Swiss-Prot record:
It catalyses: N-terminal L-glutamyl-[protein] + L-leucyl-tRNA(Leu) = N-terminal L-leucyl-L-glutamyl-[protein] + tRNA(Leu) + H(+); N-terminal L-aspartyl-[protein] + L-leucyl-tRNA(Leu) = N-terminal L-leucyl-L-aspartyl-[protein] + tRNA(Leu) + H(+). Its main location: cytoplasm. Its EC number is 2.3.2.29. It is an enzyme of class 2 (transferase). Functions in the N-end rule pathway of protein degradation where it conjugates Leu from its aminoacyl-tRNA to the N-termini of proteins containing an N-terminal aspartate or glutamate. Pfam families: ATE_C, ATE_N. Belongs to the R-transferase family. Bpt subfamily. This is Aspartate/glutamate leucyltransferase. One of its GO terms (biological process) is ubiquitin-dependent protein catabolic process via the N-end rule pathway. Keywords: Acyltransferase, Cytoplasm, Transferase. InterPro entries: Acyl_CoA_acyltransferase (IPR016181), Asp_Glu_LeuTrfase (IPR017138), N-end_Aminoacyl_Trfase (IPR030700), N-end_Aminoacyl_Trfase_C (IPR007472), N-end_Aminoacyl_Trfase_N (IPR007471).
Length: 235
């Protein structure tokens, strides 16, 4: 913690929240001149920070506490009946690890995903520059996990490999493959991978009760939520 005490942070001016438009958001960022050390990143993850591009951040809102950091303690996780069906349905998928680079194949999939699933969000319209700035970063702990069937790319789970767990940065997938539930499958796969690597948790970002796109995370039980600076387990 001594190392963390020396870090500098900066807060943004209040701005419209991208998850709850009726709220004003403030974001706390780690000083961008600070090298992104993997141990510092891991320690900050335990304090509710996330990575976006080259930045580590967490919500720092004055009048709202809706964004609750969430993680899955993988040694306690047991898939429910629906999750077992998703795992079985996707048993034909092969997963491989790749470096985070720009390829036309990745971008085409990302573009289809944003256009069909998030056309109402602040990431629309997708662009090559946006994709690269957000996801294609030359960081030693970052991975693109490719999900393929017969060489066809179905999904990419952008994941950070930390000493204390896997951080699920972002997943984009083939929007026409609804039956496969690829977003949920990617999380289940990350849980399995963290277990295989003997890591403690999968960090899912923020659970937001009143935001449909962010409240799905409590479907994975048990889950730990960071409340009053303490991780609380929900079974």
């Amino acid at each position: 913690m001594t190392e963390l005490a020396r870090l500098k942070f900066y807060a943004t001016q209040p701005h419209t929240c991208s998850y709850l438009p009726e709220e004003q958001a403030t974001t706390l960022f780690l000083d961008p001149s600070q090298p992104m050390d993997v141990q510092v990143y891991a320690d900050l993850s335990d304090m509710g920070f996330r990575r976006s591009g080259d930045h580590l951040y967490r919500p720092h809102c004055q009048n709202c506490s809706a964004c609750v950091p969430a993680r899955i303690p993988v040694n306690l996780f047991v898939p429910d009946r629906q999750q077992k069906r998703i795992l079985k349905r996707n048993a034909d998928i092969q997963v491989s690890s790749a470096k985070p680079v720009f390829t036309q194949e990745y971008f085409d999939l990302y573009q289809r995903y944003i256009e069909q699933r998030h056309a109402d969000g602040d990431m629309f319209p997708p662009s090559r520059e946006q994709f690269s700035t957000f996801l294609v970063r030359d960081l030693p702990f970052s991975r693109f996990y490719e999900f393929r069937v017969d060489q066809r790319l179905l999904a990419v789970a952008v994941t950070d490999l930390l000493p204390n767990g896997l951080s699920a940065v972002y997943t984009f997938y083939e929007p026409d493959e609804e039956r496969r539930s690829l977003g949920r499958y990617a999380i289940l796969w990350q849980i399995g991978e963290a277990t295989r690597l003997q890591l403690q948790a999968v960090y899912l970002g923020y659970w937001i009760k009143n935001c449909k796109k962010m409240n799905y995370k409590t479907q994975y039980r048990p889950i730990e939520l960071l409340t009053n600076q303490r991780w609380v387990t929900l079974y």
